[in-house]
Amino acid sequence: QRTLKVSSSGPRSFSSRSFSSGPSSRISSSSYSRVGSNSSFRSGVGFGPNYGMGLGSSIGVGGITAVSVNQSLLNPLKLELDPSIQAVRTQEKEQIKTLNNKFASFIDKVRFLEQQNKILETKWSFLQQQKTSQSNLDGLFEKYITNLRRQLDSMGQEKLKLEVELGNMQGLVEDFKKKYEDEINKRTEMENEFVLIKKDVDEAYMNKVELESRLEGLTDEINFLRHLYEEEIKEMQSQISDTSVVVSMDNSRSLDLDGIIADVRAQYEEIANRSRAEAETMYQIKYEELQLLAGKHGDDLRHTKTEISE
């Protein structure tokens, strides 16, 4: 045991003390005070929730009394806790932390929503104050809508005009398309006709070449006949001269051979002249025919060339 002595001279006071041992044991002592002639002393000892024990004493007015304290009561108690209880408490602490975090987030959300609510209230009040401006905006929008409707009507009328013009243009396109097709058909026909004309021109050219060759042949033949006739005339004249010589030699017989010679000469000259005239006439006729044929083919050739150039 330990004896604690307390003096009563003058006002005194001291605070309580506490001792703890383990998670659930606690020892506490009360305070002592004295004021004036009265004095008091209180003392107490407490433990955790599972074990409890108290010690108390009081001193009234008067002298100093010795107080005895059981020293064994001041020793810490060896208390052991159940591990399951510790786990439950840890889990409860974690749950409390989680709930505290959720509660804090809820509080933040509530504050944010309150701020948004205040902002919306401010906007609403501002919009309520701006009614006159909204009415002006309504008129402005109505004018704008009216203008748009007017533009829409004008666009509709212009659309009708454009549709009419489109129909006209489509008709013109169809007409030009038909004309184009007709021109293509005409071009095809002209190309075919050109091919035929070219064949005719080629044939005419070949005929012209043939006729020119024939003309040259006939010219050569006429020249040959003319030369032949001239030679025959010369031969006949030489024969006539020989006959006249013979007749003159026989003049001793006193025959009238001069008349006979004159008649024979006249007959030969007539035959020669007639043959010459017939040959010249035949040559002239053939020459004129060839000239006409050549002129005709020349005209056809010029006409064909003109059509080809066109």
Curated annotation (Swiss-Prot):
Region (Coil 1A): 92-127
PTM annotation (Omega-N-methylarginine): residues: 17, 26, 34, 42
Region annotation Linker 12: where it falls in the sequence: 237-260
Residue span of region Linker 1: 128-144
Asymmetric dimethylarginine sites (modified residues): 42
Domain (IF rod) ranges: 92-310
Phosphotyrosine: residues carrying this PTM: 229
InterPro entries registered for this protein in UniProt: IF_rod_dom, Keratin_2_head, Keratin_II
Pfam families tied to this protein: Filament, Keratin_2_head
Renumbered residue ranges of the record's region Coil 2: 261-310
PROSITE patterns (alphabetical): IF_ROD_2
Keywords: Acetylation, Coiled coil, Cytoplasm, Glycoprotein, Intermediate filament, Isopeptide bond, Keratin, Methylation, Nucleus, Phosphoprotein, Ubl conjugation
Residue numbers spanned by region Coil 1B: 145-236
Domain of life: Eukaryota
Disordered: region residues: 1-38
Residues bearing the modification Phosphoserine: 7, 9, 15-16, 18, 21, 25, 28, 31, 33, 37, 254, 275
Position of the Glycyl lysine isopeptide (Lys-Gly) (interchain with G-Cter in SUMO2) cross-link: 5, 123, 131, 198, 286, 296, 305
Record's keyword annotation contains Transmembrane helix: no
Binding partners and assembly: Heterotetramer of two type I and two type II keratins. Forms a heterodimer with KRT18. Associates with KRT20. Interacts with PNN. When associated with KRT19, interacts with DMD. Interacts with APEX1. Interacts with GPER1. Interacts with EPPK1. Interacts with PKP1 and PKP2.
Protein name: Keratin, type II cytoskeletal 8
Organism: Potorous tridactylus (Potoroo)
Source organism phylogeny: Eukaryota, Metazoa, Chordata, Craniata, Vertebrata
